[in-house]
Amino acid sequence: MITLMKNTPTLAALFSCVLGSLSAQPPPAAGGSPVNREAAALAEPFVGITTDGKAQPGLFHLRSTGVTTEPVKKAAGAFLAALTPEQRAKTLFPVDDSEWRKWMNVHRYVRQGVSFLEMSEAQRAAAFGLLRASLSAKGLKLSQDIMKLNHTLGELNNNNFTEYGEWLYHITVMGEPSATKPWGWQIDGHHLIINYFVLGDQVVMSPVFVGSEPVIARAGKYQGIAILQEEQSRGLAMVRSLDEGQRKQAILDANKPGNNNYAEGFKDNAVVPRTGLLGANLNAAQRKELLGLVELFVDNMDGGHAQVKMAEVRAHLEQTSFAWVGGSADDSVYYYRIHSPVVLIEFDHQRPANTRHLQKNPQQPIRDHIHVVVRTPNGNDYGKDLLRQHLLAHPH
Protein backbone atom coordinates (compact mmCIF):
# COMPACT_ATOMS: atom_id res chain seq x y z
CA MET A 1 0.00 0.00 0.00
CA ILE A 2 1.26 3.48 -0.85
CA THR A 3 1.22 5.93 2.04
CA LEU A 4 1.04 9.64 1.24
CA MET A 5 3.35 11.80 3.29
CA LYS A 6 1.90 14.83 5.05
CA ASN A 7 2.87 17.37 2.37
CA THR A 8 2.36 15.12 -0.67
CA PRO A 9 -0.17 16.67 -3.10
CA THR A 10 -3.38 14.69 -3.56
CA LEU A 11 -4.20 13.21 -6.96
CA ALA A 12 -7.00 15.75 -7.28
CA ALA A 13 -4.60 18.60 -6.63
CA LEU A 14 -2.10 17.22 -9.12
CA PHE A 15 -4.83 16.79 -11.73
CA SER A 16 -6.04 20.34 -11.10
CA CYS A 17 -2.49 21.65 -11.53
CA VAL A 18 -1.99 19.79 -14.78
CA LEU A 19 -5.40 20.85 -16.11
CA GLY A 20 -4.68 24.49 -15.27
CA SER A 21 -1.33 24.34 -17.05
CA LEU A 22 -2.87 22.77 -20.14
CA SER A 23 -5.72 25.28 -20.29
CA ALA A 24 -3.29 28.20 -20.06
CA GLN A 25 -2.20 27.62 -23.62
CA PRO A 26 -4.63 27.76 -26.56
CA PRO A 27 -4.53 25.20 -29.36
CA PRO A 28 -1.70 25.75 -31.86
CA ALA A 29 -2.45 28.48 -34.38
CA ALA A 30 -3.66 27.23 -37.72
CA GLY A 31 -0.93 27.19 -40.32
CA GLY A 32 -1.08 27.81 -44.03
CA SER A 33 -1.96 30.79 -46.16
CA PRO A 34 -4.93 33.04 -45.37
CA VAL A 35 -6.77 31.49 -48.32
CA ASN A 36 -6.27 27.96 -46.98
CA ARG A 37 -7.19 28.98 -43.44
CA GLU A 38 -10.35 30.66 -44.72
CA ALA A 39 -11.34 27.59 -46.73
CA ALA A 40 -10.76 25.27 -43.78
CA ALA A 41 -12.79 27.47 -41.43
CA LEU A 42 -15.72 27.90 -43.81
CA ALA A 43 -15.81 24.15 -44.45
CA GLU A 44 -16.97 23.78 -40.83
CA PRO A 45 -20.66 24.52 -40.22
CA PHE A 46 -20.98 27.41 -37.77
CA VAL A 47 -21.47 26.32 -34.16
CA GLY A 48 -19.95 29.22 -32.26
CA ILE A 49 -17.61 29.51 -29.30
CA THR A 50 -18.38 26.75 -26.80
CA THR A 51 -16.84 25.04 -23.80
CA ASP A 52 -17.39 21.53 -25.17
CA GLY A 53 -18.31 21.77 -28.86
CA LYS A 54 -22.04 22.12 -28.19
CA ALA A 55 -23.84 25.47 -27.98
CA GLN A 56 -25.88 26.00 -24.82
CA PRO A 57 -29.50 26.57 -25.94
CA GLY A 58 -32.01 29.11 -24.68
CA LEU A 59 -29.64 31.99 -23.99
CA PHE A 60 -30.77 34.43 -26.69
CA HIS A 61 -34.31 35.48 -27.58
CA LEU A 62 -36.09 37.64 -30.12
CA ARG A 63 -37.43 40.62 -28.19
CA SER A 64 -37.72 44.37 -28.14
CA THR A 65 -34.93 46.17 -26.32
CA GLY A 66 -36.63 49.56 -26.41
CA VAL A 67 -33.44 51.07 -27.88
CA THR A 68 -33.88 52.40 -31.40
CA THR A 69 -31.63 51.36 -34.28
CA GLU A 70 -33.07 54.00 -36.61
CA PRO A 71 -29.87 56.14 -36.62
CA VAL A 72 -27.82 53.10 -37.67
CA LYS A 73 -30.27 52.26 -40.47
CA LYS A 74 -30.22 55.85 -41.75
CA ALA A 75 -26.42 56.04 -41.61
CA ALA A 76 -26.08 52.75 -43.51
CA GLY A 77 -28.50 54.00 -46.14
CA ALA A 78 -26.54 57.24 -46.49
CA PHE A 79 -23.29 55.31 -46.83
CA LEU A 80 -24.66 53.04 -49.55
CA ALA A 81 -26.17 56.03 -51.36
CA ALA A 82 -22.76 57.72 -51.38
CA LEU A 83 -21.16 54.81 -53.26
CA THR A 84 -20.98 54.40 -57.01
CA PRO A 85 -23.04 51.53 -58.50
CA GLU A 86 -19.82 49.52 -58.94
CA GLN A 87 -18.75 50.11 -55.34
CA ARG A 88 -22.22 49.28 -54.04
CA ALA A 89 -22.32 46.03 -56.00
CA LYS A 90 -19.14 44.74 -54.34
CA THR A 91 -20.17 45.99 -50.89
CA LEU A 92 -23.62 44.37 -50.58
CA PHE A 93 -24.07 40.71 -49.60
CA PRO A 94 -27.07 38.64 -48.47
CA VAL A 95 -27.68 38.72 -44.72
CA ASP A 96 -26.83 35.03 -44.35
CA ASP A 97 -23.72 35.17 -46.55
CA SER A 98 -20.47 33.54 -45.47
CA GLU A 99 -18.86 36.98 -45.93
CA TRP A 100 -19.58 37.56 -42.23
CA ARG A 101 -17.03 34.88 -41.34
CA LYS A 102 -14.37 36.05 -43.81
CA TRP A 103 -12.18 38.21 -41.62
CA MET A 104 -8.76 37.97 -40.06
CA ASN A 105 -6.10 40.22 -38.62
CA VAL A 106 -3.32 39.48 -41.13
CA HIS A 107 -2.69 42.62 -43.14
CA ARG A 108 -2.12 40.69 -46.39
CA TYR A 109 -5.54 39.04 -46.28
CA VAL A 110 -7.60 39.82 -49.41
CA ARG A 111 -10.74 41.59 -48.23
CA GLN A 112 -14.13 42.22 -49.82
CA GLY A 113 -16.20 45.38 -49.98
CA VAL A 114 -15.15 48.96 -50.54
CA SER A 115 -11.95 50.24 -48.94
CA PHE A 116 -11.38 53.63 -47.35
CA LEU A 117 -8.41 53.93 -49.70
CA GLU A 118 -10.66 54.07 -52.76
CA MET A 119 -13.32 56.26 -51.16
CA SER A 120 -13.68 59.97 -51.82
CA GLU A 121 -13.67 62.33 -48.85
CA ALA A 122 -17.47 62.44 -48.93
CA GLN A 123 -17.66 58.65 -48.98
CA ARG A 124 -15.24 58.39 -46.05
CA ALA A 125 -17.40 60.84 -44.12
CA ALA A 126 -20.43 58.63 -44.81
CA ALA A 127 -18.50 55.53 -43.74
CA PHE A 128 -17.46 57.17 -40.48
CA GLY A 129 -21.08 58.29 -40.12
CA LEU A 130 -22.08 54.62 -40.07
CA LEU A 131 -19.49 53.88 -37.39
CA ARG A 132 -20.54 56.98 -35.42
CA ALA A 133 -24.19 55.89 -35.39
CA SER A 134 -23.32 52.32 -34.40
CA LEU A 135 -20.58 52.90 -31.82
CA SER A 136 -20.08 55.05 -28.75
CA ALA A 137 -17.78 58.07 -28.99
CA LYS A 138 -15.18 55.89 -27.25
CA GLY A 139 -15.64 53.08 -29.77
CA LEU A 140 -15.40 55.45 -32.73
CA LYS A 141 -12.22 57.02 -31.37
CA LEU A 142 -10.69 53.60 -30.72
CA SER A 143 -11.46 52.53 -34.29
CA GLN A 144 -10.01 55.68 -35.82
CA ASP A 145 -6.95 55.53 -33.57
CA ILE A 146 -6.27 51.93 -34.63
CA MET A 147 -6.40 53.03 -38.27
CA LYS A 148 -3.95 55.85 -37.51
CA LEU A 149 -1.61 53.52 -35.64
CA ASN A 150 -1.53 51.31 -38.72
CA HIS A 151 -0.01 54.34 -40.46
CA THR A 152 2.51 54.54 -37.61
CA LEU A 153 3.37 50.88 -38.25
CA GLY A 154 4.02 51.80 -41.88
CA GLU A 155 6.40 54.52 -40.71
CA LEU A 156 8.25 51.97 -38.57
CA ASN A 157 8.64 49.74 -41.64
CA ASN A 158 10.49 52.18 -43.89
CA ASN A 159 7.31 54.08 -44.80
CA ASN A 160 5.70 50.96 -46.23
CA PHE A 161 2.20 52.31 -46.74
CA THR A 162 1.35 49.67 -49.33
CA GLU A 163 1.01 47.04 -46.59
CA TYR A 164 0.31 49.27 -43.59
CA GLY A 165 -1.74 52.42 -43.74
CA GLU A 166 -4.63 54.39 -42.30
CA TRP A 167 -7.04 53.66 -45.14
CA LEU A 168 -6.48 49.92 -45.70
CA TYR A 169 -9.85 48.98 -44.20
CA HIS A 170 -12.91 47.59 -45.97
CA ILE A 171 -16.63 47.84 -45.28
CA THR A 172 -19.29 45.33 -46.33
CA VAL A 173 -23.04 45.45 -45.72
CA MET A 174 -25.02 42.24 -45.31
CA GLY A 175 -28.72 42.48 -46.07
CA GLU A 176 -30.69 45.65 -46.72
CA PRO A 177 -30.76 48.25 -43.92
CA SER A 178 -34.22 47.84 -42.43
CA ALA A 179 -36.31 48.59 -39.36
CA THR A 180 -37.75 45.07 -39.30
CA LYS A 181 -35.61 42.71 -41.37
CA PRO A 182 -32.17 41.38 -40.32
CA TRP A 183 -29.09 43.09 -41.70
CA GLY A 184 -25.68 44.30 -40.60
CA TRP A 185 -22.26 45.57 -41.52
CA GLN A 186 -18.60 44.70 -41.08
CA ILE A 187 -15.36 46.66 -41.06
CA ASP A 188 -12.28 44.52 -41.68
CA GLY A 189 -8.60 45.43 -41.67
CA HIS A 190 -5.35 45.11 -39.75
CA HIS A 191 -6.13 45.09 -36.01
CA LEU A 192 -9.70 46.34 -36.54
CA ILE A 193 -12.65 44.06 -37.21
CA ILE A 194 -16.19 44.83 -36.11
CA ASN A 195 -19.23 42.73 -36.99
CA TYR A 196 -22.50 44.56 -36.31
CA PHE A 197 -25.79 42.66 -36.68
CA VAL A 198 -29.18 44.39 -36.46
CA LEU A 199 -32.65 42.87 -36.14
CA GLY A 200 -35.40 45.32 -35.23
CA ASP A 201 -34.04 47.12 -32.18
CA GLN A 202 -31.70 44.27 -31.21
CA VAL A 203 -27.96 44.53 -31.88
CA VAL A 204 -25.19 41.96 -31.66
CA MET A 205 -21.73 43.49 -31.97
CA SER A 206 -19.41 40.51 -32.26
CA PRO A 207 -16.98 39.17 -33.19
CA VAL A 208 -14.87 42.24 -32.47
CA PHE A 209 -11.10 42.25 -32.88
CA VAL A 210 -9.14 45.36 -31.87
CA GLY A 211 -5.47 45.94 -31.21
CA SER A 212 -2.32 47.43 -32.60
CA GLU A 213 1.42 47.13 -32.98
CA PRO A 214 2.52 49.59 -31.68
CA VAL A 215 -0.21 50.58 -29.24
CA ILE A 216 1.49 53.94 -28.64
CA ALA A 217 2.75 56.26 -31.39
CA ARG A 218 5.97 57.66 -29.95
CA ALA A 219 6.90 59.61 -33.08
CA GLY A 220 5.64 60.38 -36.55
CA LYS A 221 2.43 61.82 -37.97
CA TYR A 222 0.23 60.57 -35.14
CA GLN A 223 2.66 60.91 -32.23
CA GLY A 224 0.86 60.70 -28.89
CA ILE A 225 -1.96 58.36 -29.87
CA ALA A 226 -2.32 55.45 -27.43
CA ILE A 227 -4.93 52.71 -27.22
CA LEU A 228 -6.07 50.00 -24.79
CA GLN A 229 -4.14 51.44 -21.86
CA GLU A 230 -7.11 51.45 -19.49
CA GLU A 231 -8.05 47.92 -20.50
CA GLN A 232 -4.46 46.96 -19.71
CA SER A 233 -4.29 48.67 -16.31
CA ARG A 234 -7.77 47.66 -15.17
CA GLY A 235 -7.06 44.03 -15.97
CA LEU A 236 -3.93 44.23 -13.84
CA ALA A 237 -5.91 45.88 -11.04
CA MET A 238 -8.41 43.02 -11.19
CA VAL A 239 -5.83 40.29 -10.66
CA ARG A 240 -4.13 42.33 -7.93
CA SER A 241 -7.44 42.57 -6.06
CA LEU A 242 -7.51 38.81 -5.52
CA ASP A 243 -6.44 37.12 -2.31
CA GLU A 244 -4.03 34.19 -2.29
CA GLY A 245 -6.71 31.53 -2.60
CA GLN A 246 -8.43 33.36 -5.44
CA ARG A 247 -5.15 33.87 -7.27
CA LYS A 248 -4.53 30.12 -7.22
CA GLN A 249 -7.82 29.66 -9.08
CA ALA A 250 -7.46 32.59 -11.49
CA ILE A 251 -3.79 32.33 -12.48
CA LEU A 252 -3.44 29.45 -14.91
CA ASP A 253 0.28 30.04 -15.47
CA ALA A 254 2.62 32.71 -14.11
CA ASN A 255 4.78 32.41 -17.23
CA LYS A 256 3.80 33.79 -20.64
CA PRO A 257 6.21 32.72 -23.38
CA GLY A 258 3.88 33.22 -26.36
CA ASN A 259 0.46 34.27 -27.63
CA ASN A 260 -2.65 33.03 -25.83
CA ASN A 261 -5.84 34.11 -27.61
CA TYR A 262 -8.24 31.32 -28.55
CA ALA A 263 -10.85 33.13 -30.61
CA GLU A 264 -9.21 35.22 -33.33
CA GLY A 265 -9.95 35.00 -37.06
CA PHE A 266 -11.25 31.70 -38.45
CA LYS A 267 -11.81 30.42 -34.90
CA ASP A 268 -15.60 30.76 -34.88
CA ASN A 269 -15.98 27.24 -33.47
CA ALA A 270 -13.17 27.40 -30.91
CA VAL A 271 -13.65 25.26 -27.82
CA VAL A 272 -12.61 27.50 -24.94
CA PRO A 273 -12.46 26.07 -21.41
CA ARG A 274 -14.23 28.16 -18.80
CA THR A 275 -11.32 27.92 -16.40
CA GLY A 276 -10.23 30.36 -13.74
CA LEU A 277 -11.99 32.09 -10.87
CA LEU A 278 -15.79 32.21 -10.98
CA GLY A 279 -17.81 35.31 -10.24
CA ALA A 280 -19.61 33.31 -7.56
CA ASN A 281 -16.32 33.29 -5.62
CA LEU A 282 -15.75 37.06 -5.74
CA ASN A 283 -16.67 39.52 -3.02
CA ALA A 284 -18.93 42.49 -3.76
CA ALA A 285 -16.08 44.89 -4.54
CA GLN A 286 -14.42 42.37 -6.86
CA ARG A 287 -17.69 41.70 -8.67
CA LYS A 288 -18.05 45.42 -9.27
CA GLU A 289 -14.46 45.54 -10.54
CA LEU A 290 -15.07 42.62 -12.92
CA LEU A 291 -18.27 44.16 -14.29
CA GLY A 292 -16.44 47.45 -14.78
CA LEU A 293 -13.74 45.62 -16.72
CA VAL A 294 -16.32 43.96 -18.98
CA GLU A 295 -17.99 47.33 -19.49
CA LEU A 296 -14.76 48.81 -20.85
CA PHE A 297 -15.11 46.48 -23.85
CA VAL A 298 -18.90 46.47 -24.18
CA ASP A 299 -19.02 50.29 -24.05
CA ASN A 300 -17.50 50.50 -27.52
CA MET A 301 -21.02 50.01 -28.92
CA ASP A 302 -23.67 52.73 -28.72
CA GLY A 303 -24.76 53.51 -25.19
CA GLY A 304 -28.28 52.11 -25.18
CA HIS A 305 -27.33 48.76 -26.65
CA ALA A 306 -24.26 48.59 -24.40
CA GLN A 307 -26.62 48.80 -21.41
CA VAL A 308 -28.73 45.99 -22.87
CA LYS A 309 -25.62 43.84 -23.23
CA MET A 310 -24.41 44.61 -19.72
CA ALA A 311 -27.76 43.51 -18.29
CA GLU A 312 -27.23 40.21 -20.12
CA VAL A 313 -23.72 39.92 -18.64
CA ARG A 314 -24.93 40.67 -15.09
CA ALA A 315 -27.52 37.91 -15.33
CA HIS A 316 -24.70 35.38 -15.75
CA LEU A 317 -22.15 36.94 -13.39
CA GLU A 318 -21.89 33.94 -11.05
CA GLN A 319 -21.04 31.71 -14.04
CA THR A 320 -18.46 34.18 -15.38
CA SER A 321 -14.82 33.16 -15.05
CA PHE A 322 -11.72 35.32 -14.84
CA ALA A 323 -8.47 33.67 -15.93
CA TRP A 324 -4.90 35.01 -16.07
CA VAL A 325 -1.61 34.00 -17.67
CA GLY A 326 1.60 35.90 -16.91
CA GLY A 327 2.96 38.15 -14.21
CA SER A 328 1.33 40.94 -12.24
CA ALA A 329 4.17 43.46 -11.88
CA ASP A 330 3.91 46.96 -13.33
CA ASP A 331 5.89 45.93 -16.41
CA SER A 332 4.61 42.36 -16.81
CA VAL A 333 3.17 40.95 -20.01
CA TYR A 334 -0.01 38.97 -19.57
CA TYR A 335 -3.20 37.51 -20.96
CA TYR A 336 -6.58 37.62 -19.32
CA ARG A 337 -9.89 36.07 -20.26
CA ILE A 338 -13.40 36.87 -19.07
CA HIS A 339 -15.77 34.09 -20.07
CA SER A 340 -19.48 33.63 -19.47
CA PRO A 341 -22.29 31.95 -21.41
CA VAL A 342 -23.00 35.28 -23.14
CA VAL A 343 -19.63 37.00 -23.53
CA LEU A 344 -16.00 36.05 -24.12
CA ILE A 345 -13.32 38.73 -23.79
CA GLU A 346 -9.63 38.05 -24.40
CA PHE A 347 -6.82 40.55 -23.82
CA ASP A 348 -3.37 39.41 -24.92
CA HIS A 349 0.12 40.91 -24.97
CA GLN A 350 1.49 39.35 -28.15
CA ARG A 351 4.88 38.54 -29.56
CA PRO A 352 6.13 41.21 -31.97
CA ALA A 353 5.04 40.52 -35.53
CA ASN A 354 5.76 43.54 -37.71
CA THR A 355 8.24 45.26 -35.39
CA ARG A 356 10.51 42.27 -34.78
CA HIS A 357 13.39 44.22 -36.27
CA LEU A 358 13.05 46.76 -33.45
CA GLN A 359 13.00 44.28 -30.54
CA LYS A 360 15.86 42.94 -28.42
CA ASN A 361 14.09 39.59 -28.05
CA PRO A 362 11.60 39.11 -30.89
CA GLN A 363 10.32 35.84 -29.43
CA GLN A 364 8.99 37.39 -26.22
CA PRO A 365 5.54 38.99 -25.90
CA ILE A 366 5.61 42.77 -25.56
CA ARG A 367 3.26 45.38 -24.09
CA ASP A 368 3.42 47.30 -27.37
CA HIS A 369 1.50 44.62 -29.31
CA ILE A 370 -2.00 43.92 -28.01
CA HIS A 371 -4.82 41.79 -29.41
CA VAL A 372 -8.33 41.99 -27.94
CA VAL A 373 -11.19 39.70 -28.97
CA VAL A 374 -14.83 40.03 -27.94
CA ARG A 375 -17.20 37.18 -28.81
CA THR A 376 -20.78 36.13 -28.11
CA PRO A 377 -20.46 32.42 -27.26
CA ASN A 378 -23.00 29.67 -27.78
CA GLY A 379 -23.92 30.46 -31.35
CA ASN A 380 -24.77 34.16 -31.37
CA ASP A 381 -21.65 35.68 -32.94
CA TYR A 382 -22.79 37.63 -36.02
CA GLY A 383 -26.29 37.47 -34.48
CA LYS A 384 -26.59 33.99 -35.94
CA ASP A 385 -28.85 32.57 -33.25
CA LEU A 386 -31.22 35.54 -33.55
CA LEU A 387 -31.17 35.17 -37.34
CA ARG A 388 -31.94 31.46 -37.00
CA GLN A 389 -34.94 32.20 -34.79
CA HIS A 390 -36.15 34.96 -37.13
CA LEU A 391 -35.99 32.69 -40.17
CA LEU A 392 -37.91 29.98 -38.33
CA ALA A 393 -40.63 32.48 -37.50
CA HIS A 394 -40.56 34.16 -40.92
CA PRO A 395 -39.61 31.57 -43.57
CA HIS A 396 -38.25 33.15 -46.74
PLM regions: where:
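N-terminal acidic, proline/glycine-rich, low-complexity intrinsically disordered segments
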Residues: 2, 25-26
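Bacterial N-terminal signal peptides that target proteins for export
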Residues: 2-12
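Generic N-terminal simple sequence motifs
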Residues: 5, 22-23
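Bacterial N-terminal signal peptides
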Residues: 10-21
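A cross-kingdom marker for long, charged
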Residues: 26-81, 90-396
